[in-house]
């Protein structure tokens, strides 16, 4: 694992997976927002690093720039990139990497590197917006620290603005190592946005503490930050130890749909396993999807009632680990084949097992 003192370091497999998720999501996020009614969108990388790894692989800032640059559609909206890096040597190297990309970037791209902490740099951006009575443009904030130097209050403030989203790396292994250290109490209070994390110190057994701290952060996103949709994704290593969680927060169902698409498309990483960890009673491995679990969830939610295809789709996207692409062929069609559901108002000529019409009502028996 990289040291906080290194200027560049080796790209590890679990980081490669994270970068692939970021690239896939930005490929969807940029056109959705920039082709809409917004004149500007903002991408923030709060712990940007040097922009390159020791093997020459691109870092997250370069991945973001290329994902936005390589869109197939023409984008006229201003796309601002704010890359924050506290280490001066890394920030300087990042500037060099961006300069190498600059000739290929469109004129509507605005790129800025700030050599400061995430708290100071982006806190200043938020404060400036507030002082001027301005709104933060639609923002995707990628917050990927080495440890826990991320004030929860800032995450919550970002989410008060319309069309803003966060992807936060929750470095569980490092957090767990220092959770009982007396010198870190105030830092953990800031990170969790409360003092409740202290209850996890006395928990016996690593799995209990893991779940407690995960659930506390998720609860804070839901209740303190008032984020409508929150999902967490877990990366485990070959020793079955949680390396990190990714917490994704959005108030937009379409954003959640696209993030889940990105997560599910990540290839198996050999010694690492990637899963949706939102529901403690149902961890869903992306490499081994169990559609019987989705069928059970749909049945539990709608059994004995009627629902439209659109109702079911919103439930699958918003409240399960599964994708929009999963529920028709893998759940509704086999349920209709065995008589567990039946269409209430099928249009003339409808083929059994087809659900293109979202207003189609289905009766669950």
Q: What do the predicted segments below correspond to?
A:
Residues 1-365:
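Class I S-adenosyl-L-methionine-dependent methyltransferase catalytic core
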């Amino acid at each position: 694992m990289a040291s906080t003192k290194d200027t560049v370091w080796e790209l590890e497999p679990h980081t490669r997976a994270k970068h692939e998720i970021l690239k896939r999501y930005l490929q969807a996020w940029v056109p959705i927002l920039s082709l809409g009614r917004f004149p500007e969108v903002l991408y923030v990388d709060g712990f940007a690093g040097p922009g390159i790894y020791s093997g020459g692989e691109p870092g997250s800032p370069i991945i973001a720039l290329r994902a936005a640059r390589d869109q197939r559609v023409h984008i006229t909206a201003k796309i601002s990139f704010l890359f924050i890096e506290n280490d001066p040597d890394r920030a300087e190297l990042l500037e060099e990497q961006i300069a190498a990309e600059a000739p290929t970037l469109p004129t509507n791209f605005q790129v800025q590197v700030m050599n400061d902490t995430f708290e100071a740099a982006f806190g200043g951006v938020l404060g400036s917006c507030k002082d001027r009575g301005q709104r933060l443009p639609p923002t995707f904030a990628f917050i990927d620290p080495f440890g826990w130097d991320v004030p929860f209050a800032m995450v919550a403030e970002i989410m008060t603005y319309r069309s803003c989203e966060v992807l936060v790396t929750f470095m569980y292994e490092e957090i767990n190592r220092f959770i009982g250290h007396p010198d870190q109490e105030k830092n953990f209070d800031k990170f969790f946005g409360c003092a409740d994390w202290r209850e996890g110190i006395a928990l016996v057994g690593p799995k209990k503490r893991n779940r407690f701290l995960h659930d506390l952060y998720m609860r804070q996103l839901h209740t303190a930050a008032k984020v409508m949709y929150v999902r967490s994704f877990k990366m485990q290593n070959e020793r079955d130890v949680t390396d990190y969680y990714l917490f994704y927060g959005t108030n937009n169902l379409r954003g959640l749909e696209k993030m889940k698409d990105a997560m599910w498309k990540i290839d198996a990483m050999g010694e690492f396993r990637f899963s949706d960890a939102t529901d403690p009673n149902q961890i869903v491995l992306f490499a081994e999807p169990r559609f019987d679990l989705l069928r059970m969830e749909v049945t539990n939610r709608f059994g004995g009632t009627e629902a439209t295809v659109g109702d079911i789709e919103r439930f699958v996207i918003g409240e399960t680990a599964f994708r929009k692409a999963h529920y028709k062929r893998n759940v509704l069609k086999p349920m209709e084949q065995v008589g567990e559901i039946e269409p209430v108002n099928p249009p003339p000529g409808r083929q059994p097992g087809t659900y293109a019409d979202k207003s189609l009502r289905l009766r669950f028996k």
